Amino acid sequence: HGELYRRASSARSAYAVLLPEACNDQSFAMTSSFSGMLLAAAVALRLVSADGTRAARLARLGAHVLASCVAELTSLVRAQFERVVYLGSSELKGLAREAALKMLELTDGKVVSVGEAPLGFRHGPKTVLDGSTLVVAFLSNDAYTRRYDLDLLAELRRDAVAGRVIALTNRMHLPEHSDTLVLAEDGAAGGADGAAGTPAEPLTDLELCLPYVVFAQALAMLRSLSLGLTPDSPNAAGTVNRVVQGVSIYPYGGAR
């Protein structure tokens, strides 16, 4: 176990969570470990139910991504995009940054990647777009937030500067577009985590991070392979490592 876990497990003011061994991925970039830590933190902070029902829904959605998006992922990789922009609002902004990081890590920096919020991207960051750029928008399940997401999505498609603009959503009732991928549960929006015949409570944006990130991780892995790299260890120079080296942990509140 890591030093921080060992310290926290014996501290009265800390709450340490030990994840199962299956979450301890062995590759360079964190994939299952990221998902495991995110879900564990969400449950620990009571942002996701601890009874396992919601987690099971999210697991099914993740499996749906891997089963149904292979053709789309393969098509994106064949396009050989040199830049990728991920967009997300609220919690999905953090996911956009994580998705961009995965692309950077697994392609050893050969694919320039940016993670931004839709409103922020409208300003200076938008200049990164060119014909070799893929834009992936993680659409919010919040009705108000989604209106801003869709406005920018329409603007980017209207501008026709980026090579391709796609959107991921968990909602069926959105403006139809060939580049909108619907990650629906059991073939329909919402799925069912309640009584028979009762519509499931919509997933929160925090919960959506988990199936959305599977798409981003798979895209980064396949793009890495297309560049002739080894996804488990793409950085041949050894300048970055799976576990950061040479970091000192200093006593908190010590001399300034």
Give the role of each language-model region.
Residues 40-74, 230-256:
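Internal, active-site/partner-interface "lid" segment
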Residues 82-130:
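Anionic-ligand anchoring segments at beta-strand to alpha-helix junctions in alpha/beta enzyme folds, i.e.
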Residues 121-158, 198-216, 225:
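Glycine-rich, anion-gripping cofactor-binding loops and their flanking helix/strand elements
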